[in-house]
């Protein structure tokens, strides 16, 4: 074999080996200390749902509550940072209008947003965001929020929210 043939054989072998189907990753069996009461196995989910959550937030900031409400299912439930729960789209819409009409949200940022799907098929968007809430008298308070949005048939059926003041 001459050098040219060896080089062609080497290149062909490299391409063939790199195109070979990789075996599936074997996930280790983990013995958790605490057993999850809901789910403990997720995979990355539908990123279109992240966009829906972002569009809903954009609508709230722009005070376009009708658009914000278009992302909510009729049976939506809001679990708020103060521990209260609001049930039903009409009640959640009323809450959004009352809570956000009297304030401005400034310097809004998203730190983390990702879609996950549980091994039971439940679809979620997890969002870590922050911003400043400015009241009518000009008082500004900054917050970090952590929210989870559960989706069913492309609509939000549950939102769970936590917040803390940002330094």
Residue ranges and their predicted role:
Residues 1-17:
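Sec-dependent bacterial lipoprotein signal peptides
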Residues 34, 65-114:
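A solvent-exposed, acidic/Ser-Thr-rich amphipathic alpha-helical stretch
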Residues 72, 82, 129-131, 147, ...:
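A mature extracytoplasmic/lumenal domain signature
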Residues 132-142:
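Short, cysteine-centered beta-strand-loop-beta hairpins and adjacent loop/turn segments enriched
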């Amino acid at each position: 074999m001459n050098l040219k043939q060896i080089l062609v054989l080497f290149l062909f072998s490299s391409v063939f080996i790199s195109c070979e189907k990789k075996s599936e990753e074997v996930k280790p069996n983990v013995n958790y200390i605490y057993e999850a009461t809901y789910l403990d196995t997720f995979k990355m989910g539908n990123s279109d749902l992240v966009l829906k959550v972002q569009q809903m937030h954009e609508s709230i900031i722009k005070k376009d509550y009708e658009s914000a409400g278009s992302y909510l299912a009729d049976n939506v439930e809001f679990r708020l940072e103060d521990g209260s729960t609001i049930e039903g789209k009409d009640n959640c819409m009323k809450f959004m209008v009352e809570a956000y009409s009297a304030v401005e949200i400034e310097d809004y940022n998203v730190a983390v947003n990702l879609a996950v799907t549980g091994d039971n098929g439940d679809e979620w968007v997890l969002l870590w965001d922050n911003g400043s809430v400015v009241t009518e008298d000009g008082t500004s308070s900054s917050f970090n929020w952590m929210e989870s949005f559960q989706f069913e048939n492309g609509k939000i059926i549950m939102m769970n929210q936590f917040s803390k003041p940002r330094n």
